[in-house]
UniProtKB/Swiss-Prot annotation:
GO terms for cellular component: cytosol. ATP binds at T374, P375, F376, G377, E378, G379, K380, S381. This is C-1-tetrahydrofolate synthase, cytoplasmic. Pathway: One-carbon metabolism; tetrahydrofolate interconversion. Keywords: Amino-acid biosynthesis, ATP-binding, Cytoplasm, Histidine biosynthesis, Hydrolase, Ligase, Methionine biosynthesis, Multifunctional enzyme, NADP, Nucleotide-binding, One-carbon metabolism, Oxidoreductase, Purine biosynthesis. This trifunctional enzyme consists of two major domains: an N-terminal part containing the methylene-THF dehydrogenase and cyclohydrolase activities and a larger C-terminal part containing formyl-THF synthetase activity. In the N-terminal section; belongs to the tetrahydrofolate dehydrogenase/cyclohydrolase family. The keyword NADP applies. InterPro entries: Aminoacid_DH-like_N_sf, Formate_THF_ligase, Formate_THF_ligase_CS, NAD(P)-bd_dom_sf, P-loop_NTPase, THF_DH/CycHdrlase, THF_DH/CycHdrlase_cat_dom, THF_DH/CycHdrlase_NAD-bd_dom. Residues 310-937 are annotated as: Formyltetrahydrofolate synthetase. One of its GO terms (molecular function) is single-stranded DNA binding.
Amino acid sequence: MALLLEGTSLARKVREELREQISSIKSVDPYFNVSLKIIQVGGREDSNVYVRMKTRAANEAGISCEHVNFPEDITEYDLLLAIKGFNEDPTVHGIIVQLPLPAHINEQIITEAVAPEKDVDGFCETNLGKLTKREGQPLFTACTPKGIMCILKHYGINVQGKHAVVIGRSNIVGRPMSILLEKANATVTLCHSKTESIADIVRTADIVVAAIGIPHFVKADWLKKGVVAIDVGINSIPDATKKSGYRLTGDIDFENAKEVASAITPVPGSVGPMTVAMLLQNVVESAVRFRKMSRKRKPTLLPLKLQTPVPSDIEIARSQTPKNIGDLASEIGIAKSELEFYGSHKAKVNLEILQRLAHRRDGHYVVVTGITPTPFGEGKSTLTAGLVQALSNLDKLAIACVRQPSQGPTFGIKGGAAGGGYSQFIPMEEFNLHLTGDIHAITAATNLLAAAIDTRMFHENTQSDAALYKRLTLVKGNKREFAPVMFRRLKKLGIDKTNPEELTEEEQRKFARLDIEPSTISWNRTLDVNDRFLRKITIGENPTEKGFTRQTGFDLSVASECMSVLALATDLKDMRERLGRMVVASNKSGEPVTADDLGVGGALTVLLKDAIKPTLMQTLEGTPALVHAGPFANISIGASSILADRIALKLAGTEVDEDAKKEAGYVVTEAGFASDIGMEKFFNIKCRTSGLKPDAIVIVATVQALKLHGGGPPVGPGKPIPEVYKREDVDLVRKGCANLAKHISNARKYGLPVVVAINKFSSDSPNEISAIREEALAAGATDAVDSNHWAEGGKGALGVARALINACENVDSEFRLLYDVHEPIEKKIEIIAKEMYGADGIELSPLAKERLETFTKQGYNNLPICIAKTQYSLSHDPDLKGAPTNFTVPIRDMRLSAGAGFIYPLAAAISTIPGLPTKPAYYNIDIAENGDIVGLS
């Protein structure tokens, strides 16, 4: 009597082991989950039985299994779309398609559509093809052959040197079975229904695997004594003794064969349960593999071809072939489904990624600021690019978060903002120009709101209360209705009614008339071009406007409050609320008028629905960068978005069982201007809003800039650089370090370690650099290191990177804000002026006092402060260099950004739309016949 190779108990053992494996991983990583999708089309009862069996087994093993049942008439196209979605979903680890499919759907096309890394059936050409190679490493092996090999091993049946005959040549069983036996050193003969003298061939076999799908195809007299018989077949034959009228049998004549064979598998109860068990094993293997890959997250560095002298920025950028952005995304753990591609080298990242990675602890958060800016340029953006490249060279995942530059300066005098030398963001032409159109969306939203303001005043001035109310509440069918956005205004007015017919005449008047006071309108139109002649204009001159003219102006698009909202929004809902509460004017009673009062808040959000998603790009060395938002640094926060930072921090973050300090990656972002402006706003506005806590500060300084702050002669665009800036002068550098020391002091007030990066130029001497280092350390910096990233890329900034790693991993910090928002407005301004600028105090003009009273009366007194002042001095006076003292900051006016969520006092006249110089940068910009842009810098 043959040994019964029973598989039911073995399959149960496999499921128990899988459950234990999953539980073991969950004990250290509670967020680990194993997910299987079973796709079925139609409702065949035999398919339903198999699906229920697989689902039950999956649940027993601790696997999350979803049965996705599509209707019988689903199109092949729609089925392929569904599979594509599961392929791209990083939370799905295995996909199986329950066969057969309806006749109108091509099974080959559908099964091949399953991604190889999720093909847990092991059916696809990639996995089968790799299996056939001698050294092939398929991601998955077909479940039935894998289960048979497991049965043979469990029962101690040695196949090495034996002659195995496999009957059946399907891609599911026969072919992969023959390969597995051959790889186990058996000699294999593959037969099929057309094989001649098949009985004679089978009689030579030590092992027979029958998988031909014909009941009792293999007769007992075909088998030699002591053969091992593996029966894969499961066939239904009539049996009057059974309640169902049929019974299941295999491809081998079991009752007679068991008298000849030494071992045989029963049907059912052996190969079937093990097939399902191996399917589950494949799913768990896939989940473990995905988990391992999700923790790897290390981009491959692109090599640099350094040249001396260093070529132009655009030459360097064009000499590097960027990675395909999808490949870079995959390297850092962004799923394809979480991307919206804009060509090959940039893609928007969907905000849903934050939900998937919500369990991760944040990576290290670093802000780059600088000393007080000079016409030389200190190179914060270049340092940001070089630093993330350097961190990547040290095997740390590093992501840059930077602002999208405005086209105004690009075509004006400043040029682009993609970094420089061998520390750039690429493709630099796309970075500096339209990118993904976010700034154009800001322009459209801002101008729509401006149009809504003037249009509303026009219609209120030309219609009666009744006519205005009637037109605002148009009839749908035979019923008058409020538009959904109107309920926000009704709530603001305290009118708790939903039917327009129920409002009293007074309520109708209050609802319909905004009564905007034209002199209080603070909302300008925008464009992304420097144009001084649009600073002050008159609108409404056409006769069709019936004499309703007013003076207004244009701002640069990045100066719009919409851009500030984009930078400070924490999600789509938050952006909608912020846009709706933007104050554009006051009414004639002194009450604020908002975008939602105008009914345009929702439309603004629609225009910005894509702009809210950060754009993934890369540095020259192929490290990731998230480019998003670009608000002014004087009248706004001067930093990239909260959402970009949050996404980057999760991508660079750690799982619960990883070392949160040693294994975390780095997010390096930049604050505009210096510590007194950009950094102060970054902490007190951006971090206050986001709740994120930075780990370290990098202050960028240069020898030339410190000489200017030490009393060196003034410099300006187009003028020769005085000789003192080209020769060694250690004393002048030390005097200028008073400015650096003040910025270090400012930074230390937030409880964070400070690393000074000395941006190196060829004219700098070792003595000058040593002097800066000494002064920086004396002022409280954790470290001060020179950096040559402009000429050498990431390797040139390794010293700064190592100092930063030490500061984040080994130096204690306790982040704190500078002031409590519940302090009076004047007190908050005074704290900033004294602590950040070194002032003795502040002085409010009568207009500023009037604004202060208005904002307090309107309920905006608990907002943070965003002082607009010159960037060229720690004080309000651009001519005061170094670290001035004994001065009072005059506050000439105050403005409100209610949507963005801050008040910005004006300590200087700030131009919100620059002009163009005599020779703008556009003189140098052109395009070659092959489409290459030339002259962009």
